[in-house]
């Protein structure tokens, strides 16, 4: 075994331990990953040594842990070893940041100037806090500078957002710590500078977004007391209107990075910052106490056990994405606590039947939710309750299976209740949201039954048996027969009781009996509110399960009243009058609306290229290389000769100038040349020897593209049968080194597209899964055994495809569409190896099944560290299932975000830093380092709060009834963080709810299948009318005010201020040139904003106003806007008249 794996298993468990087999499986699994990674790395290194890429070696270094990732990211030799020593010494992550920063400034990692050392120290601290995964340390901190007035400035940039609030504040704290060590003074702002901050931060909130906007008093308190000058690069085009041109502020534009650090960092994370200050013992931060007291606790209202409806999730409503439930409204989703094997980690579980009826909610669709967090990805959970509906014939039916939903969908008239929504305790803990009353479900009831001495499976019992258990064992009424008594008023209860007693009758036939009630509209409404299933036949309401119902009404089997009604609310009355315990069925409803639709699609740039090779304007609007090879600039010009900005390299052997790493003539490695635009001279230094200006590694020069293309086709042995090969208009990298044309030709052949870094990627919505069935993912038991899965999650030998198996942390289940794309990529890689690198093929894949067992890289857009994964199967959903640890290693949760997969060999062969854009944020979304082994201790801490138990204890459910803090229950519910001290952190996780199939429900949301906005809005409003928990008039009002009106007004403003664009070269003009055409290419100009973009939502807005109860104010706004649009675009009716008409 690789010695580096010893760190993950410091203790060898004895074979007597019942989990020994699990840990052994994980050991072998990690070893197999490392062996395969090493094999593929060697192949890639051999290919790279041929000199056909921008570098001679693979450009994705391997890191086996957080310490190695940080070292490779910061390029400090010996840093990884030191971090591991400090970790083994028991230091917290925060203290390690300060210790390492201290040692960097002291020169223990190499002597460097004071300013550079402080810069490295601050960046390294952020890298340690973010596990070396995100790009924030290199992209989010632009620079650190010692001001001439002897104080420290830290310039933040937009990508600092990806670090999160805690890492942002630690950068400020570490900067202060090393400032003191370096004997640099503190920052003392002027009154004008303080007021500049007070204006600029709210302005950033307007033009961008902030989670939290501090008050002017809080901003003043932070800025006037912070010993570091929190500065930033200008990130927005907006400028401040006051306090401009200040001597010590370098820009009038908004500095996004600064705003983020002060608002989402110091202001929002003040309590955490105070804790770190106390732990490290830094003086001068006593003012944090005033900030914490002044800022208050954003959750303080909810801590008072008064949980009010929250409509924040409705504030940014989008047309075509339906509201499923208004805040905490009857008929909305009923909260059920638990974690299914495919849920948790910011997801919400929904019954597949609910998904099918709603149409807009598919597997992976994002729901914006009322609580506990902001959003969650949808997963199917068949073991929770589905919706209750009213059919067109009046029947009320509970639909719990997908087959029932499919059979009844056309008959549904109204959705009375959306069913249950499964949210795990860990999400409440992560969001620090008070626990709200749990629905009365089987997992709660069975624990009360066991407490009373009952044993056995009572999941499905008859009504008679349920009542017998209540009478004999004094257990509460079974959840199946507990109705929503708390949802009706005392008056409704009295009316219902009297009506049933006076007018009802019990009729029996063939051993079955029913309760018949004469049809009464008020009784019908009350029964629907109770969610009591019944049928409407002729003029009668027929109730088949009636015994528990009449018992709760205080009636005997002859429908005679047993006793009188007394009590403050219906539930109290029911408990008193029935003689049995009846729990509240569903006190907590969760409001929700559709967020982003699910996604599983290949990554394409806009427009999508096949190769990173510049063609300038020669390729036309499509950047087509086939057009460019036939391009002639003038009558006498050479065909296929284009002029582009491209790298300058020179062969030291034969002197030929080229842009490749290896000379095409003599095979020698070329040297980089630099060009000075001022002196127009080439030299070997990056600084001009004449004028001292920084030179560029590229210049604009002629390239014989036709010759290069013909050579590439001949080299590959391909026929020139390609219609289109799309390149790029120009390279955005520092030296503008292009890809070899052979790669683009082969990508076109296999239908593969290239991303900015040279890789081919597939994007998919993130979904979690800890356990799977072989049948669900299309893999045989034999293949799974080959991959190291020998037992199911309970320890039994793996024999059939329906056993439940625990997923290994780095195994992924790809969407089928993703597997098909990666199959094309695999074939492209094999062709590349054989025809371009002259090596043996690697994948030899004929079908998607051949990809099982192969390694991939997972990467999130805001990070710079890929995570090694292994394909073990495929699911017919538009999302990617993977272990929560895998997602957390990418610093993601599963609330609806999407990440990408790429084949490992594609990344190792084709990725190059030389292709990355030379701009702020250019190194984000690039695998600058690869995490080989995922250690749960070193992933995003959110997953540490995920619960891993088989059931929540009775104490938990009782605690929810008193709105307990989730922290009170930490000792009662085992979580991932309780396992971090030993090997059991990798395996042996459990779940509370099973599901029939992880792909059940809807595959594609109606939002994606409906093509026009008109169809989407019509269906959205149709659904709003159908769902009892939705106020369709409020939805119409919000859609107009939040989406349509701002869009129309914005486009109307943009139309009057628009630029004009050349249809050929894309050059934009603020005013039309006097010649009336493009000054560069002579082509015609067109508008950039068209009248159709202004008018597109006008008719839809009028439809909503006419058909729904929209406020008069909104109607008048729309009417005035329509008049303004007509005055701009519609001419009055013209009529030819003669002078005699005026006589």
Curated annotation (Swiss-Prot):
Alphabetically list the UniProt keywords. Answer: DNA replication, DNA-binding, DNA-directed DNA polymerase, Exonuclease, Hydrolase, Multifunctional enzyme, Nuclease, Nucleotidyltransferase, Transferase
Question: Which GO-annotated molecular functions does the record name?
Answer: DNA binding; DNA-directed DNA polymerase activity; single-stranded DNA 3'-5' DNA exonuclease activity
The record's listing under Pfam families reads:
PolC_DP2_cat (PF24846), PolC_DP2_central (PF24844), PolC_DP2_N (PF03833)
Q: Does the keyword Nucleotidyltransferase apply?
A: yes
- Keyword Transmembrane in annotation: no
> Its GO biological process terms?
DNA catabolic process; DNA-templated DNA replication
Q: Per its UniProt record, what InterPro entries does this chain match?
A: PolC_DP2, PolC_DP2_cat_dom, PolC_DP2_central_dom, PolC_DP2_N
Cystine links in this protein are: none
Q: What is its EC number?
A: 2.7.7.7, 3.1.11.1
UniProt catalytic activity: DNA(n) + a 2'-deoxyribonucleoside 5'-triphosphate = DNA(n+1) + diphosphate; Exonucleolytic cleavage in the 3'- to 5'-direction to yield nucleoside 5'-phosphates
Q: How does it assemble?
A: Heterodimer of a large subunit and a small subunit.
Function statement:
Possesses two activities: a DNA synthesis (polymerase) and an exonucleolytic activity that degrades single-stranded DNA in the 3'- to 5'-direction. Has a template-primer preference which is characteristic of a replicative DNA polymerase.
PANTHER family recorded? DNA POLYMERASE II LARGE SUBUNIT
Q: Which family does it belong to?
A: Belongs to the archaeal DNA polymerase II family.
| Protein name per UniProt | DNA polymerase II large subunit
Query: Which organism was this protein described from?
Result: Archaeoglobus fulgidus (strain ATCC 49558 / DSM 4304 / JCM 9628 / NBRC 100126 / VC-16)
Its lineage reads: Archaea, Methanobacteriati, Methanobacteriota, Archaeoglobi, Archaeoglobales
